[in-house]
Amino acid sequence: MKLELIHGRPDSVDGRLKKEIRTYDLLDELGIPYERIDHKAAETMEACAEIDEALAPAAICKNLFLCNRQKTQFFLLMIRGDKQFKTKDVSKQIDSPRLSFAPEEYMEKYLDITPGSVSVLGLMNDTENHIQLLVDEDVLHSEYVGCHPCINTSSLRLKSADVFGKFLEHVHHGYQVVKIDTAEK
């Protein structure tokens, strides 16, 4: 079954979560165009291959929700899907103690997102700026970025300039660029 790329929001909100609709509402309010694919839940990068193909040429990102050992600093790391996260390398670049994956309860508390749905668009729910956004430099070089609208049964293709410009400005978040090497084969 070929996935269909649709311009804009769904025609109906039936069966869709409020957080997904809030995402479309905000993108529309900001005048950010997007294309959408609806699909079965995509919880791993491996399950995303067909989605990635349909969203091409977007940089499909792994979005990792991280924290320090004390759980006092939280980070959302956007890296290309073909790269591996090495905590030592990223921790050194941001001058932070060793990072690890943050517990699910903080993901829900700060981003209103569940595992498998982590997305830069979840920053719209982080109104008190608990989360620091880290972006792999290669993601910034892509014309488009692919991400979830706060739910993993849809994926969006947005212009990178809109995400890292209009969207982040509106939600009062900046970002720090990190360099992550391509995984060795």
Short names for language-model regions:
Residues 1-185:
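Extended, low-hydrophobicity, polar/charged segments
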